[in-house]
Amino acid sequence: MITQESPARTAGSSRPSAPAPIRSESQRIAAELDRLIGVAAAGDDRAVTDIVRIVHPLVRRYCAARLGSGGNLQLTADDVAQEICLATVQAIPRYRDQGKTFLAFVYGISANKVADAFRRAGQHTAYPMADLPDQPSTSPGPEEVALAAERRHATFELMQVLTPAHREVLVMRLILGWTAAQTAEAIGTSPGVVRVMQHRALNKLRARLRENELLPETP
């Protein structure tokens, strides 16, 4: 009697073929960028355009999380995102693989550009006065605005006790809501390292809050 080979098994093999590994969205994006960067660095304009198309919404969300409303900054999140995309395009011809994903390279540029925006805000303190409205405004009044600015300043000062890498991890994990795997992909490390960095960063923030008597001691 002649039997047919089971369709779940490959020819010449007694074992079924293994299913393709499931990749996260961040892994898929990182892989797509890594595929495009070599072609883009060789001068393919379409690949460069595709990189910007993929990168822009990612860095826009990152800038919005880091800069907030940007009321006291000279640049908005959109402005900084545009700067990041421009710097990324300018860096493509000189890009060399350094053992990390191209996505991690882009987030390195993003962190530097956001830091530049904060530095410029510290150097330039002129805030333009808006025109007076004709109708009563339902927006927050001067007291609410001042309190919100004070809270933002306190948060900014608190975050300065952390290293830049730890700040990046907290922004991505707690503000952007990324998973440890997504954060690891962005900064070029492992999910386990991300969790350790987050744990240490939060412990350092708690310690500083206790020093300032803003957090009660745990029994």
Positions of PLM-derived features:
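Glycine-rich, flexible loop segments associated with nucleotide phosphate handling
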Residues: 72-80
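Intrinsic, short, N-terminal disordered tails of RNA polymerase sigma-factor systems
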Residues: 1-42, 46-61, 65-68, 78, ...
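Structural recognition of an alpha-helix C-terminal capping motif at a helix-to-coil junction
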Residues: 79-86, 100-112
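Conserved strand-loop elements at the edges of beta-sheets that form or border functional pockets
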Residues: 53, 97, 108
